[in-house]
Amino acid sequence: MAKIVTRGDINNSLNLNNSNSNSNSNSSININNNNNSNNSNNNNLNNKNLKKCPICNKSLTNNDPNNLNGSILHSIECFVEISIALKLEFKKSISIAELNHIGKVNNIKPSQQNSPQNNSNSNNINININNNSNNGNSTSNSSDETVEGFKKRKRKDEFNTFDNQQTSNNSSNDNDDISPTTSPQLEQHQQYQQQQHQQQHHHHHHQQQQSSPIITRQQQKQLLLSPPPPLLQIETPSSPPLQQQQQPQPQQQPQPQQQQIPQAQQLRFIDSQRLKQQQQLQLEQQLFQQQQQQEQHQQQQLQQLHQQNQIEIQRYHQRQLQQQQQIQIEQQRQLLVQQQNQHQQKQIEYQKLQQQHLLLHQQQQQQQQQPQHQQNQQNQQNQQNQQNQQLLQHQQQQNQLAIIQKRLLQQQQQQQQQQQQQQQLIQQQQQQQQANHSKLLHLYQQLPQPFIHIFNSLTTEQKQVLHTRVLSHPPSDPMSPLQFVQTQLVQFNRQMDLRKSQQSQSVNTITQPQQQQQQQQQQQQQQQQQQQQQQQQQQQQQQQQQQQQQQQQQQQQYQQQVPQQQQQQQYQQQIQQQQEELVESELAISYRAAIFPYLFGTRCLGNRCPDSFKKYHIYIKNELIFSICPIQHDNNSFSNAKRVLYSALEYAGVIDNVIKSSSVVCNGCDERVGDLIRYEKRESSSGGREIQFYCSIDCFLNTNFYKKKQTK
């Protein structure tokens, strides 16, 4: 029985034992699979965590080691390759088994060999096939000698065994007669061997005509799955028990003689078959090697394609990065161009304002240098201008008074409209109350006498609750209003069981309390309306008084104004404000364009700065200028960072100037320092501006910016 086990490292040993003894001759074929691997590998090809082939231990060529389909196919291919090799070796071994079987069928009893140790002549043939397919190739190695030497020795042993059998049969006693009969199984086997020899000869001739064909893996799988050819059915009886072997065999009856095949012819036929099988094996090995070379070539091509694809992908990513960098550079360049254009426009506007200011200053100087008669003329012109301005102001006042009167009229009209709306609302409420009153009367008059008695026994609060419930009764309710009133009265009656037995009144007393209640309600509503009208009149009077006060205040303001001097001051203030706004906008533009690229909250520009201290962030009008650390960096040398800071603060109007003085006290540390002094314009509580002095940048930052930031 041949059994193939697919495991990690396959050690297939093909043992062919040919033993001739006095008792019987046994021929057996054993194929043993020895697993020499240290790890116990499962024979499950559907293992999901399969990273190596379970047959050849070869790492899978698929990119995904967990790919189930790829691992199964690879294992089947290895299985096909190994099974083909084993199948061919099995065919080779059958010929030796047949030889022994022929001797058994013909009842050829080998004679005992004269040996000092054993009386039996046994020829043991061991073929070890070790398939350690780390590279996918199957190699056949013998433990003691090579395959070719083994084949030559095997052939010599077979000839020697048959010669010894022939001589032993001839020199045996008369009891050991040889029956030259041939079995029908041997004839069938000879016919099958002749057919196979013709097919092999035809196939070999066809292969020589054609160029060496390549057997694909699919064909190998079909060969593996196809049933084997009908071999000679060799019945090898199992070895009998010891008792049967010891019993003497009965003497066989002589059989009729048949045509006996000479042993030399049989050996030649077997040798020819063996040669043909060896040739087929060599051809199949060559085809297998060619197929492996083609597969290796395809794998190399795939690897080259994969490398080329990776190179192209890297190039594509590099191009994308270059394009993104170019886009960013262009965007930055466009922003810089826009900022430069805005800066140029604001510079032009600032220059225009400076020119206007210079012209005004020149005109004032020229006016001061003119003689007195020109000044008199100017005074006259100024007086005329003042009169004209007064007339204009008077006209403006009249226009404003007219506007105020129009507003008052509009307010009065609005108040009248509001009063009318309120009266309409009151009338609507009265109409609704009358309708509700008539509705209630109609319902209560329809009530039977017991319910009227219950109604009369209710208190005023209970009646008001009943009125509201009846009026809020939805029309979609299947219960009619009369039924609803009756149910409500029944509920009140249950609550007032004690009063129901004491009170008994007539039916006609229903309308009197209702009329009294309505009259009281109307009187209350009239009083409320009168109160509302009085309140509205008071509000109108207050509004008129406020309007009169506003007019008086406006007239006083117009009278207090000095026309010419105040206008000139206002004009100068406007010019200063415009200049400050332009300076601040220029500062923002210049610092965004120039300072931020190398000072954006990262490093201090001071000399000998370890850059490990906490930085102060400078803010001007809620806008970050840059950061600086609190170390004094060479006040005498006046480092780059301080120079940038002072220039920024001077442009922003926070610090006006830098002077040297030894008589001024620092506002931050209260010390007199004869070094660089900075002073700041700040708005005081009186409305003006005061000057504060600081001896260093640390005092300035600690007192102004850093403390403010902490308080926030």
Curated annotation (Swiss-Prot):
It comes from the Eukaryota. This is Putative uncharacterized protein DDB_G0268364. Residues 178-187 have a biased composition (Polar residues). It comes from Dictyostelium discoideum. Residues 1-46, 107-264, 370-389 are annotated as: Disordered. Residues 10-46, 107-143, 161-173, 188-198, 241-264 have a biased composition (Low complexity).
